Amino acid sequence: MAAETQTLNFGPEWLRALSSGGSITSPPLSPALPKYKLADYRYGREEMLALFLKDNKIPSDLLDKEFLPILQEEPLPPLALVPFTEEEQRNFSMSVNSAAVLRLTGRGGGGTVVGAPRGRSSSRGRGRGRGECGFYQRSFDEVEGVFGRGGGREMHRSQSWEERGDRRFEKPGRKDVGRPNFEEGGPTSVGRKHEFIRSESENWRIFREEQNGEDEDGGWRLAGSRRDGERWRPHSPDGPRSAGWREHMERRRRFEFDFRDRDDERGYRRVRSGSGSIDDDRDSLPEWCLEDAEEEMGTFDSSGAFLSLKKVQKEPIPEEQEMDFRPVDEGEECSDSEGSHNEEAKEPDKTNKKEGEKTDRVGVEASEETPQTSSSSARPGTPSDHQSQEASQFERKDEPKTEQTEKAEEETRMENSLPAKVPSRGDEMVADVQQPLSQIPSDTASPLLILPPPVPNPSPTLRPVETPVVGAPGMGSVSTEPDDEEGLKHLEQQAEKMVAYLQDSALDDERLASKLQEHRAKGVSIPLMHEAMQKWYYKDPQGEIQGPFNNQEMAEWFQAGYFTMSLLVKRACDESFQPLGDIMKMWGRVPFSPGPAPPPHMGELDQERLTRQQELTALYQMQHLQYQQFLIQQQYAQVLAQQQKAALSSQQQQQLALLLQQFQTLKMRISDQNIIPSVTRSVSVPDTGSIWELQPTASQPTVWEGGSVWDLPLDTTTPGPALEQLQQLEKAKAAKLEQERREAEMRAKREEEERKRQEELRRQQEEILRRQQEEERKRREEEELARRKQEEALRRQREQEIALRRQREEEERQQQEEALRRLEERRREEEERRKQEELLRKQEEEAAKWAREEEEAQRRLEENRLRMEEEAARLRHEEEERKRKELEVQRQKELMRQRQQQQEALRRLQQQQQQQQLAQMKLPSSSTWGQQSNTTACQSQATLSLAEIQKLEEERERQLREEQRRQQRELMKALQQQQQQQQQKLSGWGNVSKPSGTTKSLLEIQQEEARQMQKQQQQQQQHQQPNRARNNTHSNLHTSIGNSVWGSINTGPPNQWASDLVSSIWSNADTKNSNMGFWDDAVKEVGPRNSTNKNKNNASLSKSVGVSNRQNKKVEEEEKLLKLFQGVNKAQDGFTQWCEQMLHALNTANNLDVPTFVSFLKEVESPYEVHDYIRAYLGDTSEAKEFAKQFLERRAKQKANQQRQQQQLPQQQQQQPPQQPPQQPQQQDSVWGMNHSTLHSVFQTNQSNNQQSNFEAVQSGKKKKKQKMVRADPSLLGFSVNASSERLNMGEIETLDDY
């Protein structure tokens, strides 16, 4: 069959056989894959499924009564979403073969698959190809099913036809447990969705290309079909009963020949392939099964043969030389396994198998090393005696062979050419063998292909040809052409083998006869129902024999579709394997089903003996024809030699013509009969036109030993007159012939000498050739040495380059390390510096902590002292209580005088306030700057009679006077000592420059305060209502003190002001730092420390104020203190502090008195006027605008807070007990923000320095404020506050008196 025709029929054989159905053994036609007409509008499966809505309501038309019996409430889901039932699964899992067998045995259906449940017909599907003709099987990723044979493959409706299509004929493997099915995820459908337009039967080639084009590790390996390689695995759960496919990976690379030209003879010998491609078996195997899967790369020629890229054949194979292999019938296979062989035939098999396994991996070279190795690799089953005879005859039987032929030559005086002729014939045969040998794959000689040992070896060269080459598809032929020298040696060895074979034939005949008798005796002795008839063997596609299996197992596998019609099977009693289709044809039924068993098959041994005899006869005929042709050539040469001596007569001319005619006839017969056997054919198979069919003819003489040219035997077809002429000519020249014989003998001797000379010359030539070979070998060694030297030089050069590169890398690394080291050093230095700073900070913290501890200790001592003083004060208070009655009359008089003084002071204070308002650029009437919160105090007081008020005040003033006398001297002394101690402690660091001038005594300060208090009382009494609440009288006194002394603009609760003022001004024993500046923020210092002694100090201090009330009555000093404390209160407001800080930063030209400007701005109500004043004094800058914006925001917040406090004031007064005002909590410490020693130092400084005093700003945190001086009127304050000489008239308050 031509190559072009073959490529057209490259599809699977079983599919063509099923489609045609022409042969007897093919099953009936199964439904072919129909070609549906494509619809005009096609929708994908997902598109159709997307149209299905589970929630669709039933149409109203169907709700009629007539439809109710057939109406279903819930819509049926699409079949793609419904899992298969068991029956459907079984139907879709059946293969073509099984369905065909069921129909053959009468158990199957007609033309469709058994069962179409739920009314589904073959037309129901998702478009093309979804009918009952689909026979499914699972991929690698589907789970071993529930059926006993592993046939429970989950076929899901969610799989499309394309996803299932090319896996229809696949069968599950032996151990595929625990793989996820399609719906559980996994790469099942990777690379599987091919939208085929044609049916699957036409698409095998396109699909193969698409498969191979995909990801090598992905789709086709994971979801590809497993096809034949797994179909032949035995299904026993614990592994194969004989050598399984997993054990021999080499077999996977054998080429599966497509049996061309032999379809009529071997229709069932083809191996069924899943998609028709010759490499399906290899592709269907997992990668881990193949040793060098990644190395086996190649291509396909036009005939579909796989060509490896490792050694591509150097020349194309002629079409007439392509091999058509047929496995030798395994007639003796079971006899080996049953022990009919002797022990000597078994042991070499094992050793040969091991040797063959080793040599098979080595490849082509291993098969060419020795004849022993190649023979054992090619035919491991050959008996060892035969091999040893061949191996020994290679060496020692060459010379006896030559001597025998020389004897035959001497008889005919033709000895000189025959020895050269016989080896030349062998060389021709070997040359013919070499061409097909190069086409045989290297794995053809795998020792795992067990062949029948007793088959006689016609020629060791032909052994590989007989092996059944049914390996895994996809493993192409590997060229085994040896090198030139090895090829010459190989030719010589093969010629020697052929010569040695002729002598071994007799021994083989005897052995064959004895074995034939044994087998026939054995076959006769087997009973008809013997167990051997129930045991079956089969040969899998890898060439292995699997079994034995009983009828039930074989029947199950056959029904499941594992066996093709070309499967070689036999019973244990049969002598050879037969195709399953032939057995079914002969038996008329499936051989595995129960029924009468035919007698054992014994025909192969007779065929083998006949073949053997035909081979021997053909060899003898070939030798005889060669010899006869040689003799005719010699006679013709003699006649030509005689023609030179004398002119030929007519008889001689006729004789010469007859000789020429005979020579031409013999040559024609030799050329007609194909002398050279076609080594590409199997020896056991008859082939038309081959030498093995040559029959001996009666017309050819078997022996000719004529002594001369004229003794040449003539054909019976020679005419009679020519024979008579020859006889007469012989009689006439008998004497002449005797002389010619002597001459011939002399000539033979000369020829013998010539032959010896030629032999010597040949030996010399061989010696020369050997020397040349030796020189060539030396030259090669020198070249190899030079190449090695060159490689060594290159290696040294590379090493030098590597060393230089490493050196450069080392230098770069050192530079990087140096840079890193420098960075590390800098980092360490930075760390050291940070550590030193941290150490200094810790030292500073330690010093501050030590100072705090000192202050705490001092405070505790002071508390103890105050406790003792309070005890003494209590005793004195008791003493004074006794004297109180004596002073009662005197106090009443003093009270009248104080009322007059208060009225006078109130009048002067009102005048002064009017002047201040005019001096401050006519501030708005809503401002509270410098005003007393009289209205608040008045509103908060209940109405009491004037007599009750006076009585309460007289009693309280008397108590204050008595207490003041006792504490005056002690307080004075303790205060001076404390100031001296703290000044000494803080002299080292953190102190501020001490104010100069003499200090006023505490008594003077207390007297001034008492006068202020009396004056304020008189003012309050004039403005109060006649009736006041009794519980608010006591607090009113303290409120008036705070307002008159401090000039507070804050309208907090009066009781609260009393407790805060008295404790913060006069409780000097709780001082912290007497040198602290006037504006220092000490909010946190005023907290819980003074809460312990506040209540104790209030009573005694109130008495001292009452005592000093009578002693000093100067109104000027009261006004000075009033003015002073008004400034202090303003400065200590948090909002005022922020304004001063911002203005100090913005006042770069030093042309602004900050406290005055702040107090002025706070009284300006209109935001526009605020912006105008700030722009006029600070300039039109972005900082000034930002300050104005924040100033307005903060002022609004402060006013909101003040209003909220005023609203809460009545509630707090109702909740407070009436007679305990000193114990109320502090709420205005944040506004005052001053510690006790600060106020005391301010009193001392301002009273002692009448001309000049600096209000010093002390650092808050670590930042010092700029010292600012308050410009005041000396007529009001009693002392001068002139600015420094560098600042002329800065900070001076202008009043109406200046104009």
From Swiss-Prot:
Biased composition (Polar residues): 369-392, 924-936, 1026-1048
Gene Ontology BP terms: adult locomotory behavior; feeding behavior; homeostasis of number of cells within a tissue; insulin-like growth factor receptor signaling pathway; mitotic G1 DNA damage checkpoint signaling; mRNA destabilization; multicellular organism growth; musculoskeletal movement
Region Disordered: start-end pairs: 112-131, 147-195, 214-247, 266-433, 733-793, 845-866, 872-891, 917-936, 957-997, 1009-1048, 1084-1112, 1195-1230, 1247-1271
Keywords: Acetylation, Disease variant, Isopeptide bond, Methylation, Neurodegeneration, Parkinson disease, Parkinsonism, Phosphoprotein, Ubl conjugation
Residue ranges occupied by any GYF domain in the UniProt entry: 533-581
Pfam family, one: GYF
Short sequence motif DDX6 binding motif: positions: 280-310
InterPro entries assigned: GRB10-interact_GYF, GYF, GYF-like_dom_sf
Mutagenesis or variant effect for H519Y: In PARK11; uncertain significance
Domain of life: Eukaryota
Record annotation: effect of changing T112A: In PARK11; uncertain significance
Modified residues (N-acetylalanine): A2
Consequence of changing F300A: Abolishes interaction with DDX6
Region (Required for interaction with SARS-CoV-2 non-structural protein 2 (nsp2)): 860-919
Acidic residues bias locations: 289-298
Ranges of biased composition (kind: Basic and acidic residues): 151-182, 225-247, 312-329, 338-363, 393-414, 957-972
GO molecular function term, any single one: cadherin binding
Gene Ontology cellular component list: cytoplasmic stress granule; cytosol; endoplasmic reticulum; endosome; Golgi apparatus; membrane; perikaryon; protein-containing complex
Modified residues (Omega-N-methylarginine): R107, R118, R120, R149
Record PTM Phosphothreonine, positions in chain: T382
Sequence motif 4EHP-binding motif, location on chain: 40-50
Record's subunit section: Component of the 4EHP-GYF2 complex, at least composed of EIF4E2, GIGYF2 and ZNF598. Interacts (via the 4EHP-binding motif) with EIF4E2; the interaction is direct. Interacts with ZFP36/TTP (via P-P-P-P-G repeats); the interaction is direct. Interacts with GRB10. Interacts (via DDX6 motif) with DDX6 (via RecA-like domain 2).
Record's function text: Key component of the 4EHP-GYF2 complex, a multiprotein complex that acts as a repressor of translation initiation. In the 4EHP-GYF2 complex, acts as a factor that bridges EIF4E2 to ZFP36/TTP, linking translation repression with mRNA decay. Also recruits and bridges the association of the 4EHP complex with the decapping effector protein DDX6, which is required for the ZFP36/TTP-mediated down-regulation of AU-rich mRNA. May act cooperatively with GRB10 to regulate tyrosine kinase receptor signaling, including IGF1 and insulin receptors. (Microbial infection) Upon SARS coronavirus-2/SARS-CoV-2 infection, the interaction with non-structural protein 2 (nsp2) enhances GIGYF2 binding to EIF4E2 and increases repression of translation initiation of genes involved in antiviral innate immune response such as IFNB1.
Similarity-based family: Belongs to the GIGYF family.
Protein name: GRB10-interacting GYF protein 2
Originating species: Homo sapiens
Gene name, Swiss-Prot/TrEMBL: GIGYF2
